[in-house]
């Protein structure tokens, strides 16, 4: 009996990622959590830290239906969305910054940048479908 339970648990674990792969195709809203942030100033070194240490949002919501990336204080429209080679590319502008977000359609991993003429923020993290 114990072997059947273990086998069933193993089968569910193996099926999990495949069942969730469709979550990252732009058809469902996502919650993204940047885990590591790098802040770089023009002509200076970069500083790395957690979102709280750097002062960036700890969670973002991507609302594909409303074409917006929603943070704790404001919402930013997605001006361009492109599907290519296993990833979604989202782009927009906000408060004088240009931003881009690349989402791995298989794993939900993300990399995002927010740049202006003085520097750039680079964020790495993961997304899930709530």
Label the predicted regions.
Residues 17-21:
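Sec/Tat signal peptide C-region and signal peptidase I cleavage site
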Residues 26-66:
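Short, solvent-exposed loop/hinge segments that bridge or flank secondary-structure elements
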Residues 34-36, 73, 94, 129:
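A mature extracytoplasmic/lumenal domain signature
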Residues 58-60, 98-105, 125-128:
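Hydrophobic/aromatic beta-strand elements that line small-molecule binding cavities or substrate pockets
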Residues 62-99:
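Contiguous, well-ordered beta-strand patches that form the walls/edges
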Residues 101-103, 110-124:
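Short, exposed beta-strand-loop hairpins at the edges of beta-sheets
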């Amino acid at each position: 009996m114990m072997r059947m339970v273990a086998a069933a648990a193993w089968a569910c674990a193996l099926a999990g990622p495949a069942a969730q792969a469709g979550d990252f195709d732009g058809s469902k809203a996502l919650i993204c959590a940047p885990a590591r942030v790098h802040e770089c100033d023009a002509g200076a070194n970069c500083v790395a830290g957690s979102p709280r240490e750097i002062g960036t949002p700890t969670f973002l919501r991507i609302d594909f239906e409303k074409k917006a990336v929603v943070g704790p204080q404001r919402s930013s429209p997605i001006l361009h969305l492109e599907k290519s080679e296993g990833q979604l590319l989202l782009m927009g502008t906000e408060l004088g910054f240009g931003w881009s977000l690349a989402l791995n359609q298989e794993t939900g991993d993300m990399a995002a940048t927010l740049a202006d003429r003085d520097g750039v923020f680079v964020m790495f993290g993961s997304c899930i479908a709530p």
